[in-house]
Amino acid sequence: MNSIVIGSGFGGIAAALRLKAKGHQVKLIEKHPDLGGRARVFKKNGFIFDGGPTVITAPYLINELFELFKKDPKNYIELSPLKIWYQFIFEDKSKFNYSGDEANMVKQIEDISKDDVEGYQKLVSFTKKIFDKGFTELADVPFDKPFVMMQQLPALLKLKSYKSVYSLVSSFIKNEKLRRMLSMHPLLVGGNPFTTTSIYGLILYLEKKWGIHYSMGGTGNIIKGLEKLMLEEGID
């Protein structure tokens, strides 16, 4: 079977490789001279800049594309786990090193607001419930019929999907610094924490499950590695 994939972002490349792994002859069409979509790079004054995403939160999804062809991802890309995920600098010049070290997270939260430690732990537990539903259960479900989505409404309402991420966080956290910090995740996907549905709170737990990784040499190097794989496997 012949298949055409339009667009060479991560989604297009992944679709092309998965189709190829199922035995399709695949042609990938891209309007730009280089691949990557939002993950394209641009060069200026001798420097290379990632044009889009830099945070890798579910590295297994990328590794899986190489493993489909029994290839070792380490021969194509290098993903390095980060110890400090984000550093927040507030108006008063105080800093918060956000990481996967829960003991250190609790200590820093305690330094800012002792009363919010329990709320933080409850927030993490609640975002796990969102993650279990929105990612583990539904990430691979095609919502191609209205009824399929309607079936999920009771569960989504129970998870307070009608709230914004900021509103959800605020129901657990009282300190404004911590509220802003813990509700920032929609920014990673171009969303507004004050208007984006709280379902995106699952990112908070997703990070804790797999950590945050950085592609050595930039996100563009992942695209290079995937391009090499596509050429090896005969994708045009």
Model-derived features with residue positions:
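Conserved hydrophobic/aromatic pocket- or pore-lining residues that grip, position, or stack substrates
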Residues: 2, 169, 226
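Alpha-helix capping and helix-loop boundary segments enriched in small/acidic/polar residues
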Residues: 53, 194, 213-217
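Helical element adjacent to the flavin cofactor pocket in flavoenzyme catalytic cores
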Residues: 202-236
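Active-site-adjacent bridging/hinge elements
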Residues: 31-32, 197-201
